[in-house]
Amino acid sequence: MIIPALLKIPKLRAKFIHSIKQNYFDEIDISIPLQNNHWAKLFRNDSYDSFSEIFIQNEYEGFIPDIEINRVIDLGAHHGFFSVWLQCKRPRSKIKSLLVEPSKRCFHVLTELTQRKEYLNNFTFFNKCIGNPQDEEILFFDRPHMAASKYKTEDNEVAIKVSVLVPEDILNWQQPPYDLLKCDIEGAEWDLLNYYNLILENTKFAIIEWHKNNKDYSQFIELIRELDFEVTNSSSNCYEEQESDDSKVLLIKNKRF
């Protein structure tokens, strides 16, 4: 009887709610209904950021190629909402999606997502990052609100070590060709183009979010062309500051297919 009485006190109730949201958010079990009997569970108090970008602001609308999509590589999966969104859009397909995400904050989220009955045996999670495959591990700065990356932004930040994804990891998951690769990895897309040629050569389309990171957009486009890809759609990222041209979303097509 003590707890109900305490909850009647507004200041105490606010403190309880704040503590639960910060420390036990996944136990609140907030799920949002989607198309075709799918649900999006908000596992953490920053889950809404990526949910909003993908399901409300439609970040990837217009960037999905008009082909049959069965095998997807989701780099920078965060909470898995891109793969969930794509599966909702294609209810007649059982999409095999490889979700790659190095963040420890997302480990529990993606582990539970891949074990849900609607994605079991179709969604696979690797807790690894994109980088030079010759390095077994690299330093990674884990942050909330989709800001995690391998780049240090604050002097007092402490990095963690994460395993590097190697091309063989992908080849052992599913044999090529791959229909679609989505890449939103906060600047590490340069590493994707430099070190994962074998995977890209066997990928029909890729959606890549480009971030400047001391290299110009023209250099990025030149590298894409050297890999025998062409840009079929491009847009300034409307979720960043519009006056800043530091990021773009691109759909690129492999000329080999």
Residue ranges and their predicted role:
Residues M1-F257:
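Phosphate/nucleotide-binding beta-alpha loop and adjacent structural elements of enzyme active sites
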